[in-house]
Amino acid sequence: MAQIKSYDTFQNVKDHIQKGRILSKGATLTIASGAITVTDSFHLVATEGAADTDDLTTINGGTQAGQILVLMAADDGDTVVVKNNSDPGSTLEIGAHFSLDTEDDSITLMWTGTKWIALSTHSNS
């Protein structure tokens, strides 16, 4: 993975951020049919239709092997269940399902080029 150098231009640094080499907060993403599409390296995730609980089975938008992604729940009253390899189209290989059920819970993932794997989880429940 390329590293930021002292002589990098602003565009080079922006490229590092967009490819997930530096954490950059993107928009809040709402689950749609079990999926989200990431555009940055950090996103809050909301349930579809403001449901109390929603399953996240697929994360689209992985761009480069080694890309890091941090997800947190958008609403303290809702639960986003990040599902481990739950269907044939799943891009998540995280070992076990993990619930983001408070605004302080997080999951950190890495894109391998074909799937997201869990690096760490943090539960404040």
Give the role of each language-model region.
Residues A2-P88, T112-S125:
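Exposed extracellular interaction/assembly regions and N-terminal maturation sites
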Residues D54, L92-I94, D101:
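Sparse, context-dependent recognition of short Cys/His-centered cofactor- or disulfide-binding micro-motifs
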Residues G62, S99-L100:
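Residue-level "contact hotspot" at macromolecular interaction interfaces
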Residues T102-G113:
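Extracellular disulfide-bonded cysteine-rich modules/repeats
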